[in-house]
Amino acid sequence: MAADPIHQFQITKLFTLGHIGGQEIAFTNSSAYMFLSVGVISLLMIGGMAGRQLVPGRIQSVAELSYEFVAGIIRSTAGKEGMKFFPLVFSLFMFIAVSNLIGIIPYTFTVSSHLIVTVALALLVFVIVLFYGLYKNGLKFFKLFVPSGVPVYILPLVVFIEVISFFLKPVSHSVRLFANMLAGHIALKVFASFVGMLGALGFLGWMGAILPLGLTVAVTALEILVAFLQAYVFTILTCIYLNDAMHPGH
Protein backbone atom coordinates (compact mmCIF):
# COMPACT_ATOMS: atom_id res chain seq x y z
CA MET A 1 0.00 0.00 0.00
CA ALA A 2 1.11 3.55 -0.64
CA ALA A 3 2.11 5.54 2.44
CA ASP A 4 0.03 8.57 1.46
CA PRO A 5 -3.59 8.03 2.62
CA ILE A 6 -4.82 10.42 -0.10
CA HIS A 7 -3.15 8.46 -2.91
CA GLN A 8 -6.07 6.02 -3.06
CA PHE A 9 -8.37 8.82 -4.28
CA GLN A 10 -6.17 9.88 -7.19
CA ILE A 11 -7.87 9.73 -10.59
CA THR A 12 -5.57 8.28 -13.24
CA LYS A 13 -6.01 8.17 -17.00
CA LEU A 14 -6.24 4.69 -18.50
CA PHE A 15 -6.49 5.75 -22.14
CA THR A 16 -7.55 8.72 -24.25
CA LEU A 17 -10.85 8.76 -26.12
CA GLY A 18 -10.03 11.87 -28.11
CA HIS A 19 -10.24 15.63 -27.87
CA ILE A 20 -13.20 18.01 -28.01
CA GLY A 21 -12.46 21.72 -28.32
CA GLY A 22 -8.88 21.18 -27.25
CA GLN A 23 -10.01 19.33 -24.11
CA GLU A 24 -8.85 15.74 -23.71
CA ILE A 25 -11.57 13.16 -23.10
CA ALA A 26 -10.03 10.30 -21.13
CA PHE A 27 -11.25 7.00 -19.72
CA THR A 28 -10.07 6.96 -16.11
CA ASN A 29 -9.99 4.53 -13.22
CA SER A 30 -13.07 6.32 -11.88
CA SER A 31 -14.91 5.58 -15.13
CA ALA A 32 -13.79 1.96 -15.00
CA TYR A 33 -15.13 1.44 -11.48
CA MET A 34 -18.42 3.08 -12.42
CA PHE A 35 -18.78 0.57 -15.25
CA LEU A 36 -17.74 -2.21 -12.86
CA SER A 37 -20.43 -1.17 -10.38
CA VAL A 38 -23.09 -1.14 -13.09
CA GLY A 39 -21.86 -4.54 -14.29
CA VAL A 40 -22.06 -6.05 -10.80
CA ILE A 41 -25.58 -4.67 -10.34
CA SER A 42 -26.65 -6.02 -13.73
CA LEU A 43 -25.27 -9.47 -12.98
CA LEU A 44 -26.94 -9.46 -9.56
CA MET A 45 -30.37 -8.46 -10.82
CA ILE A 46 -30.36 -10.44 -14.08
CA GLY A 47 -28.75 -13.50 -12.49
CA GLY A 48 -31.01 -13.29 -9.46
CA MET A 49 -34.26 -12.95 -11.37
CA ALA A 50 -33.50 -15.33 -14.25
CA GLY A 51 -35.07 -18.71 -13.58
CA ARG A 52 -36.77 -17.59 -10.38
CA GLN A 53 -37.68 -20.32 -7.92
CA LEU A 54 -40.32 -20.59 -5.21
CA VAL A 55 -37.55 -21.10 -2.67
CA PRO A 56 -35.05 -18.40 -3.65
CA GLY A 57 -31.32 -19.01 -3.75
CA ARG A 58 -28.76 -16.57 -2.38
CA ILE A 59 -28.52 -14.32 -5.43
CA GLN A 60 -32.29 -14.28 -5.92
CA SER A 61 -32.76 -13.47 -2.23
CA VAL A 62 -30.37 -10.51 -2.44
CA ALA A 63 -32.11 -9.23 -5.58
CA GLU A 64 -35.58 -9.57 -4.07
CA LEU A 65 -34.56 -8.07 -0.72
CA SER A 66 -32.96 -5.11 -2.50
CA TYR A 67 -36.13 -4.56 -4.52
CA GLU A 68 -38.43 -4.78 -1.51
CA PHE A 69 -36.15 -2.63 0.65
CA VAL A 70 -36.15 0.27 -1.82
CA ALA A 71 -39.85 -0.16 -2.59
CA GLY A 72 -40.56 0.02 1.15
CA ILE A 73 -38.58 3.26 1.47
CA ILE A 74 -40.53 4.84 -1.39
CA ARG A 75 -43.95 3.74 -0.09
CA SER A 76 -43.27 4.94 3.45
CA THR A 77 -41.79 8.27 2.35
CA ALA A 78 -43.55 9.23 -0.89
CA GLY A 79 -46.59 6.95 -0.88
CA LYS A 80 -47.82 4.71 -3.70
CA GLU A 81 -47.62 7.63 -6.12
CA GLY A 82 -43.89 7.71 -5.55
CA MET A 83 -43.49 4.23 -7.04
CA LYS A 84 -43.40 5.84 -10.48
CA PHE A 85 -39.89 6.93 -9.52
CA PHE A 86 -38.83 3.43 -8.45
CA PRO A 87 -36.37 2.93 -11.37
CA LEU A 88 -34.57 6.16 -10.48
CA VAL A 89 -34.47 5.56 -6.73
CA PHE A 90 -33.50 1.89 -7.04
CA SER A 91 -30.72 2.71 -9.50
CA LEU A 92 -29.31 5.38 -7.19
CA PHE A 93 -29.41 3.11 -4.14
CA MET A 94 -27.78 0.15 -5.86
CA PHE A 95 -25.13 2.25 -7.61
CA ILE A 96 -24.08 4.01 -4.40
CA ALA A 97 -24.19 0.87 -2.25
CA VAL A 98 -22.25 -1.30 -4.71
CA SER A 99 -19.71 1.46 -5.46
CA ASN A 100 -19.12 1.97 -1.74
CA LEU A 101 -18.68 -1.76 -1.10
CA ILE A 102 -16.28 -2.19 -4.02
CA GLY A 103 -14.24 0.72 -2.67
CA ILE A 104 -13.63 -1.13 0.61
CA ILE A 105 -11.68 -3.85 -1.21
CA PRO A 106 -7.91 -3.10 -1.03
CA TYR A 107 -6.32 -1.50 -4.11
CA THR A 108 -9.68 -0.53 -5.59
CA PHE A 109 -11.17 2.92 -6.17
CA THR A 110 -14.07 4.51 -4.30
CA VAL A 111 -16.21 6.37 -6.82
CA SER A 112 -18.29 8.16 -4.20
CA SER A 113 -15.19 9.61 -2.52
CA HIS A 114 -15.05 12.26 -5.26
CA LEU A 115 -17.27 15.29 -4.92
CA ILE A 116 -17.83 15.59 -8.67
CA VAL A 117 -19.58 12.20 -8.68
CA THR A 118 -21.80 12.86 -5.68
CA VAL A 119 -22.64 16.36 -6.97
CA ALA A 120 -23.68 14.87 -10.31
CA LEU A 121 -26.00 12.40 -8.56
CA ALA A 122 -27.45 15.12 -6.31
CA LEU A 123 -27.99 17.49 -9.24
CA LEU A 124 -29.76 14.73 -11.16
CA VAL A 125 -32.22 14.38 -8.27
CA PHE A 126 -32.56 18.15 -7.88
CA VAL A 127 -33.33 18.76 -11.57
CA ILE A 128 -35.89 15.93 -11.66
CA VAL A 129 -37.58 17.25 -8.49
CA LEU A 130 -37.67 20.81 -9.83
CA PHE A 131 -38.98 20.00 -13.30
CA TYR A 132 -41.45 17.35 -12.15
CA GLY A 133 -42.77 19.66 -9.44
CA LEU A 134 -43.37 22.43 -11.97
CA TYR A 135 -44.82 20.00 -14.53
CA LYS A 136 -47.27 18.40 -12.09
CA ASN A 137 -48.27 21.41 -9.99
CA GLY A 138 -47.55 24.45 -12.11
CA LEU A 139 -47.36 27.61 -10.02
CA LYS A 140 -48.70 25.68 -7.02
CA PHE A 141 -45.24 24.16 -6.73
CA PHE A 142 -44.07 27.42 -5.17
CA LYS A 143 -46.30 26.67 -2.17
CA LEU A 144 -43.31 24.58 -1.13
CA PHE A 145 -41.61 27.83 -0.10
CA VAL A 146 -44.57 29.14 1.90
CA PRO A 147 -45.07 27.06 5.07
CA SER A 148 -48.57 27.12 6.48
CA GLY A 149 -49.28 28.87 9.77
CA VAL A 150 -46.41 31.36 9.51
CA PRO A 151 -47.28 34.90 10.73
CA VAL A 152 -47.50 37.41 7.88
CA TYR A 153 -44.90 39.77 9.36
CA ILE A 154 -42.12 37.17 9.17
CA LEU A 155 -43.37 35.42 6.01
CA PRO A 156 -40.91 37.19 3.64
CA LEU A 157 -37.98 36.10 5.79
CA VAL A 158 -39.25 32.52 6.00
CA VAL A 159 -39.83 32.38 2.23
CA PHE A 160 -36.30 33.67 1.63
CA ILE A 161 -34.85 31.02 3.95
CA GLU A 162 -36.94 28.28 2.31
CA VAL A 163 -35.78 29.30 -1.18
CA ILE A 164 -32.13 29.35 -0.13
CA SER A 165 -32.43 25.99 1.64
CA PHE A 166 -34.13 24.48 -1.43
CA PHE A 167 -31.30 25.45 -3.75
CA LEU A 168 -28.71 24.30 -1.21
CA LYS A 169 -30.20 20.81 -1.05
CA PRO A 170 -27.83 19.43 -3.73
CA VAL A 171 -24.90 20.68 -1.62
CA SER A 172 -25.91 18.87 1.57
CA HIS A 173 -27.13 15.86 -0.44
CA SER A 174 -23.76 15.42 -2.14
CA VAL A 175 -21.30 16.54 0.55
CA ARG A 176 -22.74 14.14 3.15
CA LEU A 177 -21.97 11.09 1.00
CA PHE A 178 -18.62 12.41 -0.22
CA ALA A 179 -17.34 13.43 3.23
CA ASN A 180 -18.32 10.19 4.96
CA MET A 181 -16.69 7.97 2.34
CA LEU A 182 -13.56 10.13 2.16
CA ALA A 183 -13.06 10.30 5.93
CA GLY A 184 -13.74 6.61 6.49
CA HIS A 185 -11.28 5.46 3.84
CA ILE A 186 -8.58 7.82 5.09
CA ALA A 187 -8.98 6.46 8.64
CA LEU A 188 -8.85 2.89 7.33
CA LYS A 189 -5.68 3.61 5.34
CA VAL A 190 -3.97 5.31 8.31
CA PHE A 191 -4.60 2.39 10.68
CA ALA A 192 -3.57 -0.15 8.03
CA SER A 193 -0.34 1.80 7.44
CA PHE A 194 0.43 1.68 11.17
CA VAL A 195 0.12 -2.12 11.08
CA GLY A 196 2.54 -2.36 8.16
CA MET A 197 5.11 0.00 9.67
CA LEU A 198 5.06 -1.65 13.10
CA GLY A 199 5.17 -5.12 11.58
CA ALA A 200 8.38 -4.19 9.76
CA LEU A 201 10.09 -3.69 13.14
CA GLY A 202 10.05 -7.38 13.99
CA PHE A 203 8.57 -9.22 16.96
CA LEU A 204 8.20 -6.16 19.21
CA GLY A 205 6.68 -4.27 16.33
CA TRP A 206 4.08 -6.97 15.79
CA MET A 207 3.20 -6.82 19.47
CA GLY A 208 2.60 -3.10 19.12
CA ALA A 209 0.65 -3.64 15.90
CA ILE A 210 -2.11 -5.57 17.68
CA LEU A 211 -4.00 -2.40 18.62
CA PRO A 212 -3.96 -0.74 15.16
CA LEU A 213 -4.77 -4.14 13.61
CA GLY A 214 -7.84 -4.39 15.82
CA LEU A 215 -8.78 -0.83 14.93
CA THR A 216 -8.35 -1.63 11.23
CA VAL A 217 -10.76 -4.56 11.53
CA ALA A 218 -13.21 -2.40 13.48
CA VAL A 219 -13.03 0.47 10.98
CA THR A 220 -13.47 -1.98 8.08
CA ALA A 221 -16.62 -3.36 9.69
CA LEU A 222 -17.80 0.20 10.29
CA GLU A 223 -17.09 1.12 6.66
CA ILE A 224 -19.24 -1.79 5.45
CA LEU A 225 -22.06 -0.45 7.61
CA VAL A 226 -21.45 3.11 6.41
CA ALA A 227 -21.47 1.93 2.78
CA PHE A 228 -25.07 0.77 3.17
CA LEU A 229 -26.05 3.58 5.54
CA GLN A 230 -24.93 6.33 3.17
CA ALA A 231 -26.76 4.69 0.27
CA TYR A 232 -29.85 4.52 2.48
CA VAL A 233 -29.56 8.17 3.57
CA PHE A 234 -29.08 9.37 -0.01
CA THR A 235 -32.08 7.29 -1.10
CA ILE A 236 -34.45 8.41 1.65
CA LEU A 237 -33.55 12.07 1.09
CA THR A 238 -34.27 11.56 -2.61
CA CYS A 239 -37.69 10.17 -1.72
CA ILE A 240 -38.40 13.10 0.61
CA TYR A 241 -37.50 15.59 -2.12
CA LEU A 242 -39.67 13.72 -4.64
CA ASN A 243 -42.55 13.76 -2.17
CA ASP A 244 -42.15 17.53 -1.86
CA ALA A 245 -42.39 17.79 -5.65
CA MET A 246 -45.58 15.70 -5.72
CA HIS A 247 -47.21 17.37 -2.71
CA PRO A 248 -45.67 20.85 -2.32
CA GLY A 249 -48.40 22.15 -0.02
CA HIS A 250 -48.04 19.39 2.60
From Swiss-Prot:
The keyword Transport applies. It holds the Pfam family ATP-synt_A. Keywords: ATP synthesis, Cell inner membrane, Cell membrane, CF(0), Hydrogen ion transport, Ion transport, Membrane, Transmembrane, Transmembrane helix, Transport. Coiled coil: none annotated. It is a multi-pass membrane protein. CDD domains: ATP-synt_Fo_a_6 (cd00310). Disulfide bonds: none annotated. GO terms for cellular component: plasma membrane; proton-transporting ATP synthase complex. Its main location: membrane. InterPro entries: ATP_synth_F0_asu, ATP_synth_F0_asu_AS, ATP_synth_F0_asu_bact/mt, F0_ATP_A_sf. The chain crosses the membrane at residues 31-51, 85-105, 115-135, 144-164, 194-214, 217-237. It is found in: Cell inner membrane. SUPFAM superfamilies: F1F0 ATP synthase subunit A. One of its GO terms (molecular function) is proton-transporting ATP synthase activity, rotational mechanism. Key component of the proton channel; it plays a direct role in the translocation of protons across the membrane. Belongs to the ATPase A chain family. PANTHER family: ATP SYNTHASE SUBUNIT A. F-type ATPases have 2 components, CF(1) - the catalytic core - and CF(0) - the membrane proton channel. CF(1) has five subunits: alpha(3), beta(3), gamma(1), delta(1), epsilon(1). CF(0) has four main subunits: a, b, b' and c. This is ATP synthase subunit a. It comes from Rhodopseudomonas palustris (strain BisB5).
